Every structure is written in C-alpha cells, then in structure tokens.
Amino acid sequence: MAGRGAGAGIECWSYAPGLRLPYPMLRLRLYNAALEEYGEIALQVDTGYEGPIMLPRGEYEFFMIGELPRSLWRTYRTLADTVTMRVARAVAEVAGRRLEVYIETPLYGGGKRLVGREVLNRLRILLDGPSTWACILAQQPRGANPR
C-alpha cells in the first residue's frame, strides 16, 4: 500500500514475493541527467549491494545521456568474480526528496532492479519483516539528536 501513513511523513510498500521468502521493495521516480522523467519503478532493497541503483541493460539505456567516462566505471568483487559496472548520473525522487544518484548496469550480463547501500544510507528506512512492509520515514530535523 504505497503512501501508507503519508500524513505522518511515512511512505510504505509491501514486500514482494520471493522464491523462499518475501523481500523488501522501495519505489523511486527516476530522471536522467537531462531531467527527462523515466517514471516510477519498484526496486528490490539489497543491503549486500554496495552501489547505488542497478538496472537491467535495456532500462539503463535511458540514462546513458549522463554516462560517465569508462575510467570512472566501478568494479565490484562478488563471491565468484569481479563485475565491471557502467555508471550514469541521474536523479531519484523518493518521499518528496530529490537525490543525485548513479545508475549502474553490468558491462557484461543482464543486471537487476536493485537499490543498494549508496542510496539506502541517505534515507531513513524501516524494514518491518513481520508485517512485510518497507517504509521511508520523514527526514530528521537538522540539529536533532536521536540519542
């Protein structure tokens, strides 16, 4: 149920079914570097992915207008091998905020729809496993100390 609790500064989305267990999802509206709107998409939350947003190659093509030079592409180490990622600048809109982000896709292979820690660490997120909700909370006021 998107927008659940929106009056309280909270946006929530239901987990998606997985093969064995459901997994958390977030919905973001994406724009390329020219600020052309791609639209709103659902992305699987992946805390094991250190990067920003990964998309399949076909979807990444929309963002190629902001692609960085090859010397700035990133390489990640997986259990099996290393993966080189093409990287493009973009803007993500989530919970009323616009964030400058990078979109990645594997140089070889298909890619997936993921949101990784580079973006997640910039948001206040609640993963409510028992209720199968993923929520973005309102940003904490400046100067507030959560302790």
Task: Please state what every model-predicted region is.
Residues 1-147:
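Pepsin/retropepsin-fold aspartyl endopeptidases
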